């Protein structure tokens, strides 16, 4: 099997992002985005998705975290799509429910080629530390749009904002891990009755 490794560079007037993903990694992460909470969430994707992630970002943080947060999501989605290639042999679907203390979040995703986000998180506070919790949705939307995945997030329990967000990233990581895994029974075929994704 060819290595499923990809790199993406995204440079705008607002941000400069470099990212590298290895879908068959060991969970190694080096995240330096300038947004500590985002780095912490990227570490969840790496650790629980067994995806090696190297990301560095310089952004207009003197304004706020929005552009950096969104552009890291864009670059992650583009890099994921590139690493998946033609998607031959992948399982395609992934589902996981992750608890974190009182919080429980379920993620269901499909690497379908059709971008759609159904976002069901109810985060009770506007900030976790200095991180604006509205940016969680912005990150997921950017990933969805640029990887062309269908992503459903459902919160079944939770009152602590940090726990809810982190549970969502852990569930996303495990669901993504299932979806990108190679299914040996497919023998390299596309997981679609249409013959295209």
Curated annotation (Swiss-Prot):
Q: Does the keyword Amino-acid biosynthesis apply?
A: yes
Q: Where are the transmembrane segments?
A: none
Q: Which GO terms describe its cellular component?
A: cytoplasm
- Coiled-coil region(s): none
Q: Which GO terms describe its molecular function?
A: imidazoleglycerol-phosphate dehydratase activity
On whether Lyase is a keyword of this UniProt record, the answer is yes
CDD domains, from UniProt? IGPD
| Reaction it catalyzes | D-erythro-1-(imidazol-4-yl)glycerol 3-phosphate = 3-(imidazol-4-yl)-2-oxopropyl phosphate + H2O
Recorded metabolic or biological pathway in which this protein acts: Amino-acid biosynthesis; L-histidine biosynthesis; L-histidine from 5-phospho-alpha-D-ribose 1-diphosphate: step 6/9
Subcellular localization, as worded in the UniProt entry:
Cytoplasm
Q: Per its UniProt record, what Gene3D superfamilies does this chain match?
A: Imidazole glycerol phosphate dehydratase, domain 1
- Enzyme Commission number(s) of this protein: 4.2.1.19
- Report keywords, A-Z: Amino-acid biosynthesis, Cytoplasm, Histidine biosynthesis, Lyase
Q: Name one Pfam family in it.
A: IGPD
Which top EC class is named for this enzyme in its record? Answer: lyase
GO terms for biological process? L-histidine biosynthetic process
- Family to which this protein belongs: Belongs to the imidazoleglycerol-phosphate dehydratase family.
Q: This protein is called what?
A: Imidazoleglycerol-phosphate dehydratase
- Organism field: Gloeobacter violaceus (strain ATCC 29082 / PCC 7421)
